[in-house]
């Protein structure tokens, strides 16, 4: 049952939908799981609803659900040599950081899970993040410091060993091009977030993230999955770059939004770097005598 799912955006629970998808059919998954407690998505749908900070799930319950989805359902439908990229950040509860990315990762990768960790990329948001430094401005004393949170993690998981699925050598990437040597070559990606209110969704990741991941981990014609499709950033980028796509979301409003955005909006891929060009600088260390 593959053809009926290709190039589709479906409303439903991804666990039920994926149970009807053939095993070993997805080359690449790109997704950002729903925030555990930071976002109330139902309240966001109600235009006047306050949607931040509504506690809904205990950490253990959230992790168990995510482990079931990624270790069982998504792993089963992923091809040998395929990849799963999870965009996820820490949460802050009552002044304490909850390291959800690392807690989840410890349960997904071998020896405790099914996946292999291929890469861990830090998404540096550059122009936006969670403001926590203000409390230190008000109370400029030791032990009051809180850093602004300007990053999330992109966990790149692989099914199979490092050489799995490397038989196709079409679509050579310009590995010496500046986009790849300056921007993608390192484990920190500098990508500005989507401006607040630009898309009718509380937390869309920028299109540049799925664009890069599709370029690096898939070929044209491959099936790309987003089981938490939301506003449709993954499916939109896949559609525009000749990938087959499959998006799943629980809410009718987001399914309709994602379908609408497939052809109605242009792609937003930044042509220039957000950080200065690299250059050698003089060392401040004095030579040893």
What are these regions (language model features)?
Residues 1-257:
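Core catalytic lobe of class I
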Residues 1-17, 259-289:
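S-adenosyl-L-methionine
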């Amino acid at each position: 049952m593959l053809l009926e799912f290709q190039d589709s955006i479906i409303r439903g629970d991804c666990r039920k939908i994926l149970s009807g998808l053939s095993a070993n059919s997805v080359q690449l998954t790109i997704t950002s799981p729903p925030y555990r407690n930071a976002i109330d998505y139902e309240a966001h749908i109600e235009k006047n609803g306050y949607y931040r900070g509504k506690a809904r799930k205990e950490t253990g319950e959230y992790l168990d659900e995510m482990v079931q989805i990624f270790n069982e359902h998504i792993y089963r439908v992923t091809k040998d040599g395929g990849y799963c990229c999870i965009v996820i950040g820490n949460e802050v509860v009552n002044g304490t950081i909850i390291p959800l990315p690392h807690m989840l990762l410890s349960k997904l990768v071998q020896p405790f899970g099914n996946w292999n960790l291929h890469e861990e990329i830090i998404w540096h948001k550059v122009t936006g993040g969670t403001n926590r430094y203000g409390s230190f401005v008000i109370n400029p004393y030791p032990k009051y410091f809180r850093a602004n949170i300007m990053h999330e993690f992109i966990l790149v998981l692989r099914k199979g060993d490092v050489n799995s699925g490397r038989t196709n050598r079409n679509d050579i990437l310009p590995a010496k091009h500046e986009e790849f040597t300056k921007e993608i070559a390192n484990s920190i990606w500098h990508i500005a977030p989507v401006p607040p209110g630009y898309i009718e969704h509380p937390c869309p990741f920028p299109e540049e993230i799925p664009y890069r991941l599709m370029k690096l981990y898939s070929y044209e014609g491959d099936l790309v999955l987003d089981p938490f499709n939301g506003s449709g950033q993954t499916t939109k980028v896949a559609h525009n770059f000749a990938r087959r796509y499959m998006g799943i979301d629980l809410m009718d409003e987001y399914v309709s939004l994602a379908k609408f955005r497939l052809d109605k909006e242009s792609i937003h891929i930044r042509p220039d770097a957000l950080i200065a060009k690299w250059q050698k600088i003089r060392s401040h260390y004095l030579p040893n005598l």
